[in-house]
């Protein structure tokens, strides 16, 4: 597990019929994001006296659908400012490059 500091913030909310959970993860927290055989894992962790952790596993087709919907949504709104756009663009290019170089060879 490779944890990284959160340089911005994240918020999580889970709404069950009889319970509601929410929590924030800021600069004093950390995250993990990794590719797995069946999809991706994203973990947010907060230490200290208010300890909490959340993990989400997204299978590849769901993750692809989420990325596609984000792309559509970004295309329909005003452009994001350069301070936020540049790291998002660099990360998206890195993801694309990693996917293109790791195409498995057909069996047989």
Report the location of each language-model feature.
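Positively charged, low-complexity terminal tracts
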Residues: 1-108
